[in-house]
């Protein structure tokens, strides 16, 4: 089967609805059978065999052979399968849903189909007698759908996946039947699939539901035209941050009609999982929503791997791309998603030459108006440029302001800039509700609830945190400074965003209502950002050794400094830890400094205290003593007084990054050596 039969389309409750087919409808569809292709209903043999019929057996009740699943409260006897399989139908009663044999034996439609659906059955051979029971079983299992009919209701989708409530109505381009069919063709062919389409068409919110549905029906199969035992594995939606895992996981759970995670086909996976996010009912076909780090640690436990936001070049996601390319045969399907491939399309086509590009048309659901506010200062004069930008942002909030009860997002580069702009806007625009949102903001859901409840116009001042996979219900305006802070070993620098980031930021509006995108930078100055050249290279080495990759050839993005890569390899070798031990630690611990692996490898109380420090920020004397003993030194080279504190120029004195210089602010004048606790905190 290459094409998705319409009877198995996922109900969007907009144009496609759950539907139970009658025997008369089945008979009317028979002439549409095309040549040697199996009838659409024949493919119901897969989900029935995988789910409803698992563990089923034949019984005789009041003279009728039926499945134990069909029994009523009366007495019955179990019938050996070998005996029941001798039955051959002579007549069929479409009202009673029964076949009658030449000897007068009566068997239910579903029981007959159950007996005939054995491994090796070629579905193109399914005749009407077999199809009748597949339709009955499929109706009882609630796996069929169809285009809108008179009286169609969203309520009919309740129970399709064991859901208490109906599927949410989803008028998204990604759930149109042509988009479903295109995605299914690539998924069934096991070709790498790159899903593109503007923000708001439903990639993150809808495509995972489709793949869960396909996996539930047909996952784990080699050839859909020949019935065989299925090797079922879950679908994983892999995301770069915990906040996105929680937000999207719960949104998917609600969209599938479940009031809680427990008992649903959605599982969240991130470090230190909160009890409220646990789900003990792990169905084999489930949708796992996971951080990239945890996905990479158990990659081949999944049948379909969905990597979202590939344009972000999250380190773990880029490593995962390399592993999936080298070990294609160990997963069934690879699906990559991005709103924009401006910076990546050529490399993806080279990396996965047989990839299927599935474009979902429609940039956003609503119109977006662009407004350019020019900064006349020379960007090389940072102070003048910043001061004019602040004036421009304040003026734009007067000229282009959200209505009462709506909000805007102001994108800046760093947490410090968030706080600075929040103070400015609070002072100059007291009529606005001003909120700061970034990766370290506690309880973002509660903050957004406050924004939604506000009668005032609000502004969310944010780092790129709000750039991806987030729909804010009341947002109508984006104000974009065009800045991003790119971390680097022992520091980082502020840069202009890439074209892909511009597309993402612009796409925060136009999802739920018309929007305005106000930008304060010159788009002609934008260029792609090669993040690997601003990252520690240790994880690339650790995961490459575990998965048998050749460095740097197998990497999706290769570092520019290959000599640095070699020095990092030699440095890790000096730890005296086996590659598998390093992999275990990298995939289960934060390892904010790779040198922490030496403490974790020794185990004991010190390792547990270090784990609490990394996860919760709990600092003890023992933790500091353990880290200090690693001798991670930096030298203070010089200092100058600035705004009531000293700004020190320091130099890393250990490892492959020795000689890297960074700035350190402290109220005291420091001299000599300091000891690094993390790459951005120190003790004397």
Curated annotation (Swiss-Prot):
Region forming the signal peptide: none
Show the SMART domains listed in the entry.
Answer: DEXDc, HELICc
* Secreted keyword on record: no
Q: Which GO terms describe its molecular function?
A: ATP binding; ATP hydrolysis activity; RNA binding; RNA helicase activity
Segments forming domain Helicase C-terminal? 392-563
Which InterPro entries does the entry mention?
DNA/RNA_helicase_DEAH_CS (IPR002464), Helicase_ATP-bd (IPR014001), Helicase_C-like (IPR001650), NPH-II (IPR021892), P-loop_NTPase (IPR027417)
| Keyword annotations from UniProtKB, A to Z | ATP-binding, Helicase, Hydrolase, Nucleotide-binding, Transcription, Virion
Q: Which catalytic reaction applies to this protein?
A: ATP + H2O = ADP + phosphate + H(+)
Q: Where is this motif: DEXH box?
A: 308-311
Q: Which Pfam families does the UniProt record give? A: Helicase_C, NPH-II
Chief localization: virion
The record's Gene Ontology cellular component field reads: virion component
Q: Where, per UniProt, does this protein localize?
A: Virion
Tell me where on the tree of life, at the top rank, the source sits.
Viruses
**Domain named Helicase ATP-binding: residues:** 184-359
Q: Which E.C. number(s) belong to this protein? A: 3.6.4.13
Q: What class of enzyme is it?
A: hydrolase
Positions annotated to bind ATP: 197-204
Q: Which PANTHER family match?
A: ATP-DEPENDENT RNA HELICASE (PTHR18934), ATP-DEPENDENT RNA HELICASE DHX37-RELATED (PTHR18934:SF99)
Instruction: Report the family membership.
Output: Belongs to the DEAD box helicase family. DEAH subfamily.
- Assembly mode: Monomer.
Q: What does this protein do?
A: NTP-dependent helicase that catalyzes unidirectional unwinding of 3'tailed duplex RNAs and plays an important role during transcription of early mRNAs, presumably by preventing R-loop formation behind the elongating RNA polymerase. Might also play a role in the export of newly synthesized mRNA chains out of the core into the cytoplasm. Required for replication and propagation of viral particles.
Name of the protein in its database record:
RNA helicase NPH-II
Q: Which source organism does the UniProt entry give?
A: Molluscum contagiosum virus subtype 1 (MOCV)
Q: What is the lineage of its organism?
A: Viruses, Varidnaviria, Bamfordvirae, Nucleocytoviricota, Pokkesviricetes
Q: Which gene encodes it?
A: NPH2
